Amino acid sequence: RCDYNIINYCNKYFYDNKLIVYKEAKKDSMILVYNDKGKYVDSDKVSFVNLREIITIEGLINSDIANKFIITPFKNQANNLCEKYSKERCGTIHTFQGKGEKEVYFTTVLNNTSEGRKHLQGNHNLFTNELINVAVSRAKDKFVLVTDRNFFFENDKNVKNLIEYIEAYGEIIPDKTVCIFD
């Protein structure tokens, strides 16, 4: 069901190249939208929200939520997204287990703040292989990663692998959104 580049990422990192992929690759099927400027994450000690990444996603989808899922590991980010879009279109990774859509936007939320670093070092790190596999493989035609590239490149192997894969086989777009959090 997925574009070649999307399912090939999962095949390479999670299935030991045992999947047989029948779809052809499109260059724009995997996109990295990165911002390394704004260091804003709000936390209630249980979950996180990054309004800057929400604003970025708003600019990317232009209010057209049809055929799109917006996925995040964090409940607070999902709740904020659901206030803007329908609950059927936004949620945590677990929300979309077993579902698929043409486009998936994955907001990683964390950046180089003490809260972000603590989360990645803790026992409840939500960037496991299993969860990243679910997030990526929900996308049929396009997967868009909205993230702080440098932070994850330095602090999380699993997201770093995803970033490197997109940089090799997809498109890289610096986020040019003007935001009060920068």
Where are these regions (language model features)?
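Active-site proximal loops enriched in glycine and acidic residues that flank catalytic Cys/His/Asp
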Residues: Y34, T72-F74, T92-H94, T107-T108, ...
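Conserved motor-coupling elements within RecA-like helicase/translocase cores
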Residues: C82, C90-V104, N111-T113
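Helicase C-terminal subdomain and adjacent C-terminal extension
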Residues: N11-Y13, V21-M30, Y85-E88, T113-D182
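Conserved nucleotide-binding/hydrolysis micro-motifs of P-loop NTPases
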Residues: R1-Y4, K75-A78, F96-Q97, L110-T113, ...
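Hydrophobic, well-ordered secondary-structure elements that form the walls
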Residues: I6, I57, I70, G98, ...
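A short acidic (Asp/Glu
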Residues: I7-N8, N76-K84, E101, N155-K157
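Structural motif
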Residues: F69-I71, Y105-T107, V136, V144
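Conserved helicase/translocase motor-coupling segment
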Residues: N17-K84, R89-C90
